[in-house]
Amino acid sequence: TREVDLFAFNGQPFLQMAGIGADGRSVELTTWEMKKKWKAFAYVIAGARAFTERQPLLTLTTDDGRVLEGRSIIFGNGRRYGGPMKLFAEANNEDGLLDAVVFKHAAPSIIRESLLALVHGGFHSLRYGGFEYVRMTEGQVAAIGHAACELDGDYAGDAPVQITRAGKLKVFAP
């Protein structure tokens, strides 16, 4: 066994990933029937619909005072995001830090940056583009417009969000 970091949005814990904005909206739009019929592809279908909608303006304020604005934010407590995709190059689920990618622009930029990240081994602080990569212990997200949230692939309400480090969780791992 080992202990991994556990973070929470408004007191709701998550282990691996979270998202606010387009990612959260994609999960919100994904129905149980879609998941049964299309499996993981259901999220792609819902994501295409979410990207046709107006994206909220999000403001992430970290515990060390950084303020970042964007249209969508994904959080990773480990390198992987949504299965085998390695999107957070610097993430480590035992370091006490939550990694975040703040997308500055809406849909086309998010898609382009995500595809480039997959090719380049994930997002990291040394690569520049239409996003900012930050590492934090706690923070908050405010929104102008509807900003759905997801935690580990489940819809978890809407912003505003208070992000906290909820402690450690013992897991069985190889």
Regions found by a protein language model. Give the residues of each.
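Glycine-rich phosphate/pyrophosphate-binding beta-alpha loops
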Residues: G19, D23, I74-F88, Y155
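Short acidic/glycine-rich loop or secondary-structure boundary segments that cap or lie
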Residues: D23-S26, L68-E69, Y81-P84, P108-I111
